[in-house]
Amino acid sequence: MASPSCLWLLAVALLPWTCAARALHHLDPPAPLPLVIWHGMGDSCCNPLSMGAIKKMVEKKIPGIYVLSLEIGKTLMEDVENSFFLNVNSQVTTVCQTLAKDPKLQQGYNAMGFSQGGQFLRAVAQRCPSPPMINLISVGGQHQGVFGLPRCPGESSHICDFIRKTLNAGAYSKVVQERLVQAEYWHDPIKEDVYRNHSIFLADINQERGINESYKKNLMALKKFVMVKFLNDSIVDPVDSEWFGFYRSGQAKETIPLQETSLYTQDRLGLKEMDNAGQLVFLATEGDHLQLSEEWFYAHIIPFLG
């Protein structure tokens, strides 16, 4: 039989292990990865009927999550106006600075962009790898641009009337490129050379003028790149752009999928390699532009955020 002194020594020896086991048992589960949201044209960060509702839906399903809905400007009205008239490259630079300063994002974050916010957040992923973006979810984003005039119902309709006239007059003029957001992802398939040489945003992030290896490396670092396409979209033209497809070069009638584009076959962004590795996710839903049901959102989007 062991002596009392031996038992005492054994208890002392086991004490650290017992304390460690108790500490591990009481550790809180890891916090969910933060989420950064970028709204679309004519919207704002905190509209209770759009981004505000999305934020609440995410918080409902993922308790404790930190959600940053980006506000581009000092007021909600300025945020809306900037979605039409503030140079996209300037917006991306500002967002990169905001994310870099946010202590809650430094270990990584997921990103979800709505409509034009989808391609804007892709620019963030390509240009600003720190803090790291883990998953990018593009909801109706136009990654090959648009070649159709925007339709804006309601209060923004007069702005879109102005945009139509301006794009028709000269989408690739320097003054229009610098001051009109929608011109910066205007992609004319009939004038590919003009687009390639004068688009100050989309042609750059799609590697149309040359290969920036850091863009490719940074995009390929994503765990998942999710693209949501709206099958009855009446705003985005062509709708295939939501899955990185576009018009076949030289005309504006026949569209081709991503896999048939030169961007993919030449693998200028690493999309072919990502596709083969299962990093690209293509989702489709019925409905018009950005018309999502809660049930569909919970079933198909939340799994990439939890």
From Swiss-Prot:
PANTHER family referenced in this protein's UniProt entry, alphabetically: PALMITOYL-PROTEIN THIOESTERASE 1, PALMITOYL-PROTEIN THIOESTERASE/DOLICHYLDIPHOSPHATASE 1
Organism, scientific name: Macaca fascicularis
Stated name of the protein: Palmitoyl-protein thioesterase 1
EC number(s) from the headed UniProt entry: 3.1.2.2, 3.1.2.22
Keywords: Disulfide bond, Endoplasmic reticulum, Glycoprotein, Golgi apparatus, Hydrolase, Lysosome, Secreted, Signal
Disulfide bonds: 45-46, 96-128, 152-160
Function: Has thioesterase activity against fatty acid thioesters with 14 -18 carbons, including palmitoyl-CoA, S-palmitoyl-N-acetylcysteamine, and palmitoylated proteins. In contrast to PPT2, PPT1 can hydrolyze palmitoylated proteins and palmitoylcysteine.
Any one GO CC term of the record: nucleus
Post-translational modification remark: Glycosylated.
Glycan-bearing residues: 197, 212, 232
Major subcellular site: other
Signal peptide location: 1-27
Gene3D superfamilies: alpha/beta hydrolase (3.40.50.1820)
